[in-house]
Amino acid sequence: MESFKYCFDNDGKKWIIGNTLYSGNSILYKVRKNFTSSFYNYVMKIDHKSHKPLLSEIRFYISVLDPLTIDNWTRERGIKYLAIPDLYGIGETDDYMFFVIKNLGRVFAPKDTESVFEACVTMINTLEFIHSQGFTHGKIEPRNILIRNKRLSLIDYSRTNKLYKSGNSHIDYNEDMITSGNINYMCVDNHLGATVSRRGDLEMLGYCMIEWFGGKLPWKNESSIKVIKQKKEYKKFIATFFEDCFPEGNEPLELVRYIELVYTLDYSQTPNYDRLRKLFIQD
């Protein structure tokens, strides 16, 4: 794809391709619209057609992250916005497929406590919406939470999972999947090979929150075996967990309560999002 200077999406929009932002399983390019300024304000994610995660992500954007559905959902609840990107284009070549979203800024790195509290509320709102549509995100980690102009965006929907089987019954807990993702933020269920459920998304968000509030994850730089062992042990001894995350004893009580509530959720249980959200709403 490096040899291409531009390409057209399925609606005929022309996208001029700039520098590579990231190269891994998929490739991210800076892109801009034709006949606009010289600034590359968009990002194109591209991969080979045989790569199923990108296809799944495109389908998720189309079928679940519908702007009208999001608008209705937020208006009914009096929510300003959800941390969900808008989709600006989808396309394919003979061998590749791609989609285009706005350049959503940098990884969220809060500078004050107020911004952390706001981020916690926004992310709980966003996960509640995704869960209400019958899916989990499955890959909550800091690098997937971006900020631009004080607005958060949750990206990377390549590992979403359906919550329900036919007949609207919750998926069963089975440890039969190959795990993938950043082991530092992975939920215990995913470590063990189970599909990420609602509690898993919220658990992963909790690990992000710990770092946002200035704590450290005690299993950083450990092997995957040691990481899962520590996480399972810490779930039994939450006080010890926070002593190790915040050695100076400055852990926020709101965060401690959040982790306590999330750790007690059953695999198929519907979380009390309002209770979790209220922990971080400041008067």
UniProtKB/Swiss-Prot annotation:
The keyword ATP-binding applies. Gene3D superfamilies: Transferase(Phosphotransferase) domain 1. It comes from the Viruses. One of its GO terms (molecular function) is protein serine/threonine kinase activity. Pseudokinase that plays a role in viral DNA replication repression by activating the antiviral protein BANF1 and inhibiting the activity of host VRK1, a cellular modulator of BANF1. It comes from Vaccinia virus (strain Western Reserve). The keyword Nucleotide-binding applies. InterPro entries: CK1_Ser-Thr_kinase, Kinase-like_dom_sf, Prot_kinase_dom, Ser-Thr/Tyr_kinase_cat_dom. Residues 1-283 form the Protein kinase domain. Interacts with B1/VPK1. Interacts with host VRK1. Interacts with host VRK2. PROSITE patterns: PROTEIN_KINASE_DOM. It is found in: Host nucleus. Keywords: ATP-binding, Early protein, Host nucleus, Nucleotide-binding. This is Pseudokinase OPG198. Disruption phenotype: Deletion mutants exhibit rescued DNA replication and viral yield in multiple cell lines when B1 kinase/VPK1 is deleted.
